[in-house]
């Protein structure tokens, strides 16, 4: 009888050990998965442009040689597209600053500067448009950007979507980068015909061969 009881106790102990061994890899896998997920989330957070408080935005604006037509702008905290200034850090010494200027009827204007730690330099941007009777787009360099802007911190780029009318079925969109602090056009799309098609989808518009 004692022999049978001893065998039963040994069997129960072996069964408990096996179940614990089976759970251990699952727990380790869960920990590894959680760690990997945290790394991905951290990477995504690091890709986002620097978020500035309203006070920080005003501090940046005071560093810029803004003209009188660009009044002091108080952003609406509830509107992510409302801002006084945004920054894109290119490196330890250079920062691109996007300052909201005039509001406009359906899209605002922006002045963009390169800050080197001591002074701000106004930047100009190549824009391509078709001017009748010409049928091919021609380039002009503008210092004031009308439209919606967005920084891509991971790619160190500025994205612009400029509408010719409120419907957004015509206009242009561009992606700019800043190698060595110089403005470069990486991508440009233009749609001159306001025909109601492809509204708010500038990525579907004809691409322009940039110079």
Task: Label each region the model flagged.
Residues 1-4:
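Positively charged n-region of N-terminal signal peptides that target proteins for export
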Residues 11-13:
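C-terminal motif of bacterial Sec signal peptides marking the signal peptidase cleavage site
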Residues 15, 69-71, 100-102, 169-171, ...:
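Sequence contexts marking disulfide-bonded cysteines in secreted/extracellular proteins
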Residues 15-94, 205-211:
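Terminal domain-start segments
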Residues 70-71, 114-128, 177:
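Surface-exposed loop/turn elements that mediate protein-protein interactions on large endomembrane-trafficking
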Residues 90-100, 152-161:
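Acidic/hydrophobic-patterned starts of short beta strands in beta-sheet-rich repeat architectures
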Residues 105-113, 168-175:
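Structural motif
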Residues 124-211:
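Short aromatic loop motif centered on NTY/YTY
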């Amino acid at each position: 009888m004692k022999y049978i009881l001893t065998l039963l106790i040994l069997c129960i102990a072996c069964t408990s050990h096996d179940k614990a061994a089976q759970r251990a890899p699952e727990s380790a896998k869960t920990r590894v998965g959680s760690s990997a997920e945290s790394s991905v989330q951290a990477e995504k957070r690091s890709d986002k442009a620097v978020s500035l408080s309203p006070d920080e935005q005003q501090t940046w604006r005071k560093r810029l040689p803004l003209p009188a037509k660009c009044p002091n702008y108080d952003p609406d905290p509830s509107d992510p597209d409302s801002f006084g200034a945004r920054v894109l850090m290119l490196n330890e010494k250079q920062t691109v600053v996007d300052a909201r200027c005039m509001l406009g009827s359906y899209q605002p204007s922006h002045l963009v500067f390169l800050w080197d730690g001591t002074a701000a330099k106004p930047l100009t941007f190549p824009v391509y448009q078709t001017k009748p009777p010409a049928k091919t787009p021609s380039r002009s360099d503008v210092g004031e950007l009308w439209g919606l802007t967005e920084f891509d911190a991971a790619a160190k780029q500025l994205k612009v979507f400029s509408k010719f009318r409120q419907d957004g079925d015509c206009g242009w969109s561009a992606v700019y980068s800043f190698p060595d602090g110089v403005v470069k056009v990486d991508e440009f799309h233009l749609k001159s015909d306001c025909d109601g098609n492809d509204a708010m989808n500038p990525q579907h518009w004809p691409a322009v061969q940039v110079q």
